[in-house]
């Protein structure tokens, strides 16, 4: 792990963007209905290889995310399978079109968001922390967050096979080592399980390694769950969380207010869950310009913070919403 970025150290060819670039080109060779769309960022978002091989099937609309989203909806209506690739922070510009042109009509558009979550020294405006909260409020939109390169490739194919809109998000930087599942279910994967686990940790995408580190150090027996398709929250995941855990912890690289943690808390409330809860993610505030590692520490999103959440949720005697606090002065 790089001490400044908080990301795995690996050559660029093993980065998230490179995996997407290889996989979308491979898919495009086999399916002529797949087209790529981007907003003045063909190579930064990983569509360069696709464009080199099929220049008439990759469209760069310029700095016009609203137009890109509407064009994707139109191409989908015409029978194509558009893949709209953006930086996460720039999807905000196409929010209205995502709702009214794509989701309202259930068009099979796949939105791929690079640099999702805390990006660190790209600058305050480039932190992609809004997408999960945005996606959570859009009816019919499925949202996936891969934990490693193999999952990125698999989820991209699942998104393109879906008969409605789908969103795929992943962070900037290098990939972790492959993270195998202990078992797979309709709602996602079990990645770690202590003996007679008392606390369930739901880890989203790039936060899976952080959750696994905390689980390995925890004195409280823990089970780590990866929902894969994080939104909407699957009924099967709620059933799993209602199956006897004393506490539930969620960890996501995005706004915790309105994001996956909030959606899980609401689902558990509706189901009558009475255990403790801790929801870890970015606060509802603008992040300043700092390294990713520093931002994670400031926001209370490190393995130590997850450990604190496990401890607090596991010992709660009744329904309680708990959130570990980071070092705000860092």
Where do the language-model regions lie?
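Phosphate/diphosphate-binding loops
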Residues: 80-170
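Extended, hydrophobic alpha-helical segments in both membrane/secreted and soluble proteins
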Residues: 46, 58, 65-85, 94-98, ...
């Amino acid at each position: 792990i790089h001490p400044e970025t908080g990301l795995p150290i690996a050559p660029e060819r093993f980065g998230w963007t490179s995996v997407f670039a290889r996989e979308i080109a491979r898919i495009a060779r086999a399916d002529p209905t797949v087209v790529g769309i981007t907003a003045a960022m063909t190579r930064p978002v990983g569509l360069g290889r696709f464009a080199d091989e099929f220049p008439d099937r990759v469209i760069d609309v310029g700095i016009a995310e609203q137009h890109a989203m509407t064009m994707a909806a139109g191409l989908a209506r015409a029978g194509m399978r558009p893949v709209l690739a953006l930086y996460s922070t720039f999807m905000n510009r196409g929010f209205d079109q995502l709702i009214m042109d794509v989701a309202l009509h259930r068009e099979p558009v796949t939105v791929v968001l690079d640099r999702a979550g805390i990006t660190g020294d790209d600058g305050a405006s480039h932190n992609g922390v809004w997408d999960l909260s945005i996606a959570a409020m859009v009816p019919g939109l499925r949202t996936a967050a891969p934990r490693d390169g193999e999952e990125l490739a698999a989820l991209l194919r699942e998104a393109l096979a879906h008969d409605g809109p789908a969103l795929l998000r992943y962070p900037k930087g290098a990939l972790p080592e492959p993270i195998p599942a202990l078992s797979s279910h309709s709602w996602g994967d079990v990645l770690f399980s202590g003996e007679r686990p008392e606390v369930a940790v739901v880890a989203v995408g790039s936060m899976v390694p952080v959750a696994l580190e905390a689980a390995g150090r925890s004195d409280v027996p823990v089970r780590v769950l990866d929902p894969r398709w994080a939104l909407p929250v699957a009924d099967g995941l709620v059933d799993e969380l209602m199956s006897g855990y004393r506490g539930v912890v969620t960890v996501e690289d995005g706004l915790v207010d309105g994001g996956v943690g909030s959606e899980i808390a609401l689902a558990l409330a509706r189901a009558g869950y009475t255990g403790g809860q801790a929801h870890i993610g970015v606060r509802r505030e603008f992040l300043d310009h700092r390294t990713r590692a520093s931002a994670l520490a400031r926001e209370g999103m490190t393995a130590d913070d997850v450990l604190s959440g496990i401890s607090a949720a596991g010992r709660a005697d009744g329904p309680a919403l708990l959130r570990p606090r980071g070092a705000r002065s860092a």
